């Protein structure tokens, strides 16, 4: 970044904002980059501002029992705020003085007032000077107030972030992500521009008092008639505003419903295409869109009338002020035109400035109170450690999480349940396990490990393993007992947290660099091969949570970070969840057992190999110590521990009834037990009321950016970013984000891809806490890159789940004193980590975009023509009256009084021509502004255009190839459907209407003035030319600065979410100072762009006003010097010239707003123009009597129409090559093999070898070459969707969209309830569905969070059974399953797909043993394709991975022992990253 010219700018340069000329010139000539932006002045840097405010806030906390944040702000900013307020007041006072001088100028043309004619020129000079003074006062004052607002926002941004890093985990569980993001977006954004209006809360009343005094002097009591009209108008506008909010509130729920479904569609677009659900999703979203648009139109009409009422009110105010006085006493022209000028100022003060100021204070004080409450929340406590201690000891440790009483929770749950539309017939479903809430997470834990020992912690789901580690870290505070260790701790979370930066920075993490240690860690964690594949090696920048890495790569980087730190105690929480068997084995031996052999280690695991090599084993069960000792002691004392804890061995021996009972209990335990708020309907915010049954089931919220996993319901989510965020300020437990934009300002729409987009979160019954985000895991198999995007709540932050054992903890770990923190931050790395891709659209909206927008709907052209006809008719009528006026010079009749008294022209008889003219012009302007015959059709048609564009964009996204979608960020896609569609619905129609109406008013006024005085037209031409050139010059730069500012906003929210996700790691490593510095860096980048945008905008506004001042000076002197005795002409010319000044500037701003908003149209068109992957084949809806398989009939020249395809499931793959993008690197090369009908094939290979990619290639989701045949039919001769229907899919990332069970199983409505129940019974879902009220009509929300991951897998299995697919693709189906559901799936696949071809990608050896053949993929190619016997007889990956015990299972005849073995200790299921263990949900 360059040094800002502001530092050395002169006073004159600062006054006229001339220091911004270099950036304006550069932006006009070329596209601006971040490097072109000026550095933030030191006075605006986040470090300095936050330090000052933090110092004053600490002072406030120390000195008072009830500290007030506003007092700290007052001490920091008050005097400058007062100074700029005085300047603003002086500038506004000039508006009241101008009409007085105008009246004197008109009076000087009185034929009997010759003595004043000589001073008319001086009065004109004085009037012009007032305009100059106002310009020099108002612009610095407005900019100064905006600058103060910006500084206040920056300081509070930083204060909130620092506080967030200090909050106890217990508090974090009670604060929603929505509340945090709202504090940093909605609330604080009000300060930047709103502060400029704050002073009008006292300026406007003073101004009204002054103006009414002057009007009293002119019209006596009649002046109050005009005031009464303005008050009535203000009340009418308030009523319209209330009605508008009513419709917007009703619409908010519908918008969120649509955005939730859209977000789920985008997040799971690969699954949507695999299931061929494009048509179903399109219909579902369009139905919601129709209901939303009805309310959108009503809200738009209310706002339209509000806007129109302001314009036409001017005539009535003047008319009702003057008319009584004229009837009673007669009136002179001077008083008429002076009254007009006074009323213009009065109307602005009463209807715009004062209400705006009151709203600003209301919003600002509310935001300050929210921030004040947040800053006073409980912080985590620093634990005391003994640095000389070498052992780790726990003595009689017990810990609780929940502080809230059980009775209160139960009452809330019952109340929520009673409020549901579908009654719950079995309340036990929601309340059966609430008694566990009062139970401790850990009970009476005792153990002692010496230096250098390895403690393996095992246990079932929810046993308390992670809680144990959190206790050692200090995040969970023990209620009894004591913990003893040195405090020098390193921690590896099971959540594979990756911070923005390079691989090397992620591993070193601020610790001093040691080359030998670094290389040793890389080697031990098996990262050498992965790093060597990157061109930048370990300096490759990982953005957005490392989403471009595989799950295994992220897990190994997280482990390497923990191992690299030199600590006394290493806490490793299930670090091997996403590693293949071979890699896991190598890392455990080389890293855990060798590299860290002399260190104390606590490893959470359930693998038998790990338990055997541990020095001590601690097995937890329901929070208690089930066993503590060595492995040999475990074999002797607890030989049945595996079946005791997991229910694994005995499951197949249970009866069908017993299995159903176990499955039902699994649903309760895994889905509902831990979260007391599972069935709570939190209080809905008044402004976001839901309508309809579907809306009753959820929160009005969608967080476009981060999904976390539900406790026990283990489903990986990919973060999206969203725009627009609302929050309930009254209820601290409220979990709500909203994408509903503030229709009053385009900047109010934040998405935040970047929010940070994120996935959807319904306003449902589950708690959306920050802790959910900490326990969130990014989907490991997703190929998208997710983010949140900026300009309007781009940020997509949405935790989608709770956790289990990651309870809420309230203590901090002391910072490691040995850390050498490196605070250097590379700006390019920061940009690469955080920024969105630069939009490939022109810096200024092209005429082609306008033309294309106008021609979307043919009615729009007709409406615009109709508007033009009305305008021409009004102008023609005005010109006719002017012609009559010019050709019928009135003879003025005088009201003569006694001699010595002066006479004044009174409005009677012929003189009333002027008065009649003014009435006519007022009526014409009223029709022009109100536009009843023009405005309503225009607004209505523009909303229809928005509807058409949304439909086209939705269809385009659904039909776009995955290669195109993979190149886009999901947050960016969601922003098109949220922020941009909101702009097309709300802002663009009314902004276009305002611009057209203002432009026509200005053109009409110029026409009138030019007819009265043709010389003025000569002055108008250069003014218009200057305006057009200046606008074009400014737009090139301003739009680029706005885009850079929008991109710069994303890092702020992304960094907040990143920090929260890794908060436990941050605290364990003591990296809070580094992340505060990183946050300030991101904040300064945004400030640099925003400050420069405000400065250039003020430069432009000032230049526009200077041009208008010159124009007014020219008009004034031309009219004075060329007009004869006509008072009327001078009055009309000067009054309209003053009106032109204000209206034209408003029109200029509107034109800039239109151009800015039209960029959303450009982005939508860009999505509409995406390529299509193939014409969709309409789904065939069979009759109820048809067999299920009849749906697979295809129209193809190779198959007879009476035949059914596929019939056997034979697959022949020839030279298959796959690429993510066309022309990219091949990720699979020359794959060839064949599969016989009904054969089971297992895919083998290391993490990232391409197993999941091969399954995607089968579905034609990638760019592929080669050929695949199914039962002799080639994919080249088969329609794309029909080809995909041949496959049944159980993906690694399960897709449950928001809707009923029936809709999720049968989105097209093809099957009867009887058929659905039959399939549900086959896959073991019947007992699950029957537990819910409404059964098949129960509405699932938030990705089906009330279901465990296993039940979601069963849903996918049921879909495949319903489709009667002959080929089943399974991608890690058991990755996140409890053993019970895993057995159900294994049994169902054996039975339901006994005659089908099955292709399985799996990490569990026992599942792979059932396959007849194995395809070994290595380095993107097929290395082996053979039977299991052949692979075991050769040296292969499979032989290295399989254990001797598994070989005995395969070949039992090789075991000479004939006796029946007793209960064996079998491998406990390894709990993966998503299997968050928690005893409280």
UniProtKB/Swiss-Prot annotation:
InterPro entries linked: AAA+_ATPase, ABC1_TM_dom, ABC1_TM_sf, ABC_transporter-like_ATP-bd, ABC_transporter-like_CS, ABC_transporter_C-like, CFTR/ABCC7, CFTR1_ATP-bd_dom1
Enzyme class: isomerase
Catalysed reactions, semicolon-separated: ATP + H2O + closed Cl(-) channel = ADP + phosphate + open Cl(-) channel; chloride(in) = chloride(out); hydrogencarbonate(in) = hydrogencarbonate(out); ATP + H2O = ADP + phosphate + H(+)
Pfam families named among the record's database cross-references: ABC_membrane, ABC_tran, CFTR_R
Annotated TM spans: 78-98, 123-146, 196-216, 223-243, 299-319, 340-358, 860-880, 920-940, 992-1012, 1015-1035, 1097-1117, 1132-1152
Listed GO CC annotations: apical plasma membrane; chloride channel complex; cytosol; early endosome; early endosome membrane; endoplasmic reticulum membrane; membrane; nucleus
Residues in the Cytoplasmic compartment per record: 1-77, 147-195, 244-298, 359-859, 941-991, 1036-1096, 1153-1481
Lipid attachment residues per UniProt (S-palmitoyl cysteine): 525, 1396
Record field: compositional bias (Basic residues): 1453-1462
EC number: 5.6.1.6
Region (Interaction with GORASP2) residue spans: 1387-1481
Residue ranges annotated for the ABC transporter domain, each copy included: 424-647, 1211-1444
Keyword Secreted: no
Modification Phosphothreonine, positions: 718
Full protein name: Cystic fibrosis transmembrane conductance regulator
Gene designation: CFTR
